[in-house]
From Swiss-Prot:
Major subcellular site: cytoplasm
Name under which the protein is recorded: Octanoyltransferase
Residues the record lists as binding substrate: 69-76, 143-145, 156-158
Catalytic residues as annotated in Swiss-Prot or TrEMBL: 174 (acyl-thioester intermediate)
Record organism: Rickettsia felis (strain ATCC VR-1525 / URRWXCal2)
Length: 209
């Protein structure tokens, strides 16, 4: 069974990035076992490889870090669970298929949120997991941005639990102008991070056996 490592304190994004990259190298060179990091970051805006500078609107005192993951700008901060699976897609029980991997991540998040009775949506050409908040309007509750090196995955998923959603106003999230974001709290669901972690770990192990 996969090992989940929960980092208890707010983590600087740059420290986490080095942690991930170092472990990816160990998986590649030393065949270290797969792991999943569960992290909560201090406030940061991150840019994926497809970002446009004009999508960074007003970042104030919040640091901006340019990463190697897919996607565009997003926000990480307290109250958001960020999950970094480091999986070896070249191993016998996996598949060398990045699209399939992302589809499995989507299925895992959908199943986890379904636990709370939240109906979720995947919208064509809009990466992430969405919920309907008003007639004809959808808000993103989870972002996905991954990278693969020699078929070992890193970066991952960010799910808004009790995130300060106002911080997303400093960017055009994921390059989608006028897009909305939401959280479990905003949807009326209040849960401790540790309890949420139990659910996502259970559902993760069902998908990534």
């Amino acid at each position: 069974m996969l090992q989940f490592i929960t980092i208890p304190n707010l983590m600087d994004y740059r420290v986490t990035l080095k942690l991930m990259e170092d472990y990816v190298n160990k998986v590649i060179s030393d065949n270290e076992p797969e792991i999943v990091y569960l992290v909560e970051h201090s406030e940061v805006y991150t840019a994926g490889t497809n970002y446009k500078q004009e999508e960074l609107l007003n970042y104030g005192d919040i640091p901006v870090i340019y990463t190697g993951r897919g996607g565009k700008f997003t926000f990480h901060g307290p109250g958001q669970r960020v999950i970094y699976p480091i999986l070896n897609l070249a191993s016998p029980n996996r598949h060398k298929d990045l699209k399939l991997y992302i589809k499995m991540l989507e299925e895992w998040i959908i199943n986890s949120l379904n636990y709370f009775g939240i109906k979720t949506y995947i919208i064509k050409d809009k990466v992430g997991i969405w919920v309907k908040v008003r007639k004809g309007e959808f808000a993103k509750i989870a972002a996905i941005g991954v990278r693969v090196r020699k078929w070992v995955t890193y970066h991952g998923v960010a799910i808004n639990i009790s995130t300060d959603l106002s911080k997303f106003s400093g960017i055009i999230p994921c390059g989608l102008e006028n897009s909305l974001v939401t959280s479990l709290n905003q949807l009326g669901i209040h849960i401790e991070m540790s309890e949420f972690d139990k659910i996502i770990q259970t559902e993760f192990n069902k998908i990534f056996k």
